[in-house]
């Protein structure tokens, strides 16, 4: 019976008293029963904003009462206690669920800290639930800081737990101003995101543009096509409601700002040193830009008739208008960078013979992966890189009415949407996993569906037939099995489920890898990527490499970051300090007080062209945001 607001329940065979309104977790803790939980762990939703799919889900228990079915599994942090409730916290079923849910959290952890060194924040929970190892661990590839002679800081190991700050403060008595903002830390190029958002909130887009340009020469490009890893780590999205639209706020000053940032921009006197850069993509052009500002003579060799690399021939104009890309490349050229087009480089010896003291290779990853099925070289089958290059250069491409695309990444989505704009009546993407596992950006997938692209999930190609100009693609249905090396569940064919799709053109978009000319005489590693040292130097003296040719296919912002790092390393190699730091706007006073953070504020509304209008041409689909929406969004 309920007495004085107290009720009786049973936890693991022991009767305890609890107050009405308490959760099972609160009641258990009051009675000194341990139920693992990570309510306030970085990256997980804290109470009371907890959403089951976004919480740690480690505090699961089996509960039984008049409202909960016999033995039903519930989250103890949100389930209230009731009279005569029976709770079990450690059954085999509960332990298995806890191990599975803990794995989902640990996949972001550095493996050697938790399981080899057995020294991490989650060690007690790991031991308690009986987790022995992470079957598939996907390490992050973030830069290490080697500038300090006393320690090496590897950002790949950082989970923003603030443990290092507590140790310095509590044990060594060394305080810090504050930990790095997660969004700032997540930006590969190190753009000061909180600062430019603060400036936009104050109605200063010119200053915001200057802050962005302190780290990247492509604000307009990145404001449109950056995958925005910073938004995944946005503190507001993790702790309050929804992430700030960081990418769109980057585009706003690029669209509305002026050239006042140039007043503080400086180019150092000539050093008399010459550098050759092979590839005019984001990595090569970024490297050239910063080396030129350091006073070096920089020449970029580009095999294509247009500069920009995959920004020019890989990303369609409806996502990245040509005038935006062209204007930002022209700004790079104004620093003294020379770009030679239709200039393919097959040997590095010839460049050294021309007097270049250093070479930076930024040749991308353009060799396309094979489907590995019979008939994939049949007429009517085209590789995605070739297809997009021809489409984006305005060449004539005959594709017919029925087009199929194999793949689930951004390149597959771009290929499908480009096919619609070439007049295809039916475009189908065939992907071997579900939409949840698609690596393509979610907004790109949504826009493709709006435009009429069909996506068929859980299917994979098994054979291609081509006869009398008729193309048939045999597909087999799949089911998801155990996780593979990417951390995603491996698709497994279902026997006897083969079916045929009739097509006019099949576009293969399952991935690319670097194509390294033999004449370069350089060591390569897994995936045919160039092997480099920490400073991006290769196995050959004076030769550096970065971007997709070193990392494999990655984001534009990663390539820009590689270009920055290469410029620093090459300058040091040539006797400089490697300092590419710029201060294009005076420091402003930051807010030093804490305010209540309102929840539920609406996200900035982004306008798009109507789907039927999109596919009739190459007009930009995403229209950006204006003053009326940018400032309130920045103020969230």
Per-range role (PLM):
Residues 52-299, 303-304, 311-318, 365-367, ...:
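Fe-S ferredoxin-like electron-transfer domains
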Residues 200, 207, 269, 274-278, ...:
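Feature captures the FAD/FMN-dependent oxidoreductase FAD-binding
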Residues 253-269, 327-342, 368-422, 524-541:
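Glycine-rich dinucleotide-binding loop and its adjacent helix/turn
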Residues 279-282, 408-409, 548:
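Glycine-rich Rossmann-fold phosphate-binding loop(s) that bind the pyrophosphate
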Residues 297-340, 391, 416-463, 578-593:
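Rossmann-like dinucleotide-binding cores of NAD(P)H-dependent redox enzymes
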Residues 377-400, 483-553, 557, 561, ...:
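FAD-site-proximal beta/loop scaffold in flavoenzymes
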Residues 415, 549-577:
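A conserved FAD-binding loop/helix module that cradles the flavin
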Residues 446-452, 460-467, 471, 479-481, ...:
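Mid-to-C-terminal Rossmann-like scaffold of FAD/NAD(P)H-dependent oxidoreductases
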């Amino acid at each position: 019976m309920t007495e004085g607001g107290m009720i009786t329940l049973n936890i693991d065979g022991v009767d305890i008293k609890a107050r009405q309104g308490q959760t099972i977790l609160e009641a258990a803790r009051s009675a000194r029963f341990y139920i693992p939980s990570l309510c306030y762990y970085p990256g997980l939703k804290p109470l009371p904003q907890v959403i089951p799919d976004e919480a740690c889900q480690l505090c699961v228990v089996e509960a039984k009462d008049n409202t909960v079915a016999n033995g039903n599994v519930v989250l103890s942090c949100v389930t209230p206690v009731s009279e005569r409730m029976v709770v079990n916290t450690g059954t085999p079923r509960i332990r298995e669920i806890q191990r599975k849910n803990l794995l989902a959290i640990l996949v972001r952890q550095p493996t050697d800290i938790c399981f080899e060194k057995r020294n991490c924040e989650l060690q007690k929970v790991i031991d308690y639930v009986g987790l022995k190892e992470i079957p598939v661990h996907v390490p992050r590839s973030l830069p290490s800081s080697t500038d300090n002679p006393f320690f090496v800081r590897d950002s790949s190991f950082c989970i923003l737990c603030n443990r290092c700050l507590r140790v310095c403060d509590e044990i060594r008595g060394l305080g810090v101003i504050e930990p790095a903002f997660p969004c700032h830390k997540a930006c590969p190029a190190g753009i000061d995101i909180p600062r430019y958002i603060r400036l936009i909130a104050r109605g200063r887009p010119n200053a915001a543009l200057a802050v962005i340009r302190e780290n990247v020469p492509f604000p307009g490009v990145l404001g449109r096509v950056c995958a925005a890893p910073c938004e995944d780590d946005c503190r507001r999205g993790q702790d309050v409601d929804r992430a700030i639209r960081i990418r769109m706020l980057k585009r706003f000053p690029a669209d509305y700002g002026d050239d006042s940032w140039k007043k503080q921009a400086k180019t150092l006197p000539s050093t008399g040193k010459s550098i050759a850069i092979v590839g005019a993509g984001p990595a090569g052009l970024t490297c050239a830009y910063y080396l030129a500002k350091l006073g070096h003579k920089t020449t970029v060799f580009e095999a294509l008739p247009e500069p920009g690399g995959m920004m020019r021939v890989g990303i369609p104009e409806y996502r990245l208008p040509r005038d935006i890309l062209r204007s930002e490349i022209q700004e790079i050229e104004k620093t003294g960078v020379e770009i030679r087009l239709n200039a393919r480089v097959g040997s590095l010896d010839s460049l050294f013979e021309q007097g270049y003291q250093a070479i930076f290779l930024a040749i991308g990853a353009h060799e396309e992966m094979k489907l590995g099925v019979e008939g994939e070289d049949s007429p009517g089958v085209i590789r995605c890189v070739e297809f997009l290059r021809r489409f984006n250069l305005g060449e004539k491409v005959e594709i017919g009415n029925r087009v199929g695309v194999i793949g689930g990444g951004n390149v597959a989505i771009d290929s499908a949407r480009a096919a619609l704009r070439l007049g295809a009546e039916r475009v189908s993407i065939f992907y071997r996993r579900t939409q949840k596992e698609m690596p393509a950006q979610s907004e790109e997938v949504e826009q493709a569906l709006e435009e009429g692209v069909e996506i068929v999930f859980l299917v994979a190609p098994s054979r291609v037939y081509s006869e009398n100009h008729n193309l048939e693609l045999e597909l087999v249905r799949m089911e998801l099995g155990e996780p593979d090396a990417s951390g995603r569940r491996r698709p497994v064919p279902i026997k006897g489920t083969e079916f045929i799709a009739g097509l006019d053109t099949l576009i293969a978009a399952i991935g690319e890898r670097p194509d390294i000319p033999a004449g370069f005489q350089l060591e390569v590693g897994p995936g045919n990527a160039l092997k480099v040292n920490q400073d991006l130097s290769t196995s050959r003296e004076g030769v550096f490499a970065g971007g997709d040719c070193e990392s494999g296919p990655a984001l534009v912002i990663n390539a820009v970051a590689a270009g920055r790092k290469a410029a620093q390393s090459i300058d040091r190699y040539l006797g400089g300090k490697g300092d590419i730091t710029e201060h294009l706007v005076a420091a402003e006073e930051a807010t030093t007080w804490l305010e209540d953070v309102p929840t539920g504020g609406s996200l900035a509304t982004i306008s798009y062209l109507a789907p039927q209008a999109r596919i009739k041409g190459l007009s930009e689909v995403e229209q950006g945001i204006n003053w009326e929406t940018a400032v309130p969004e920045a103020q969230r």
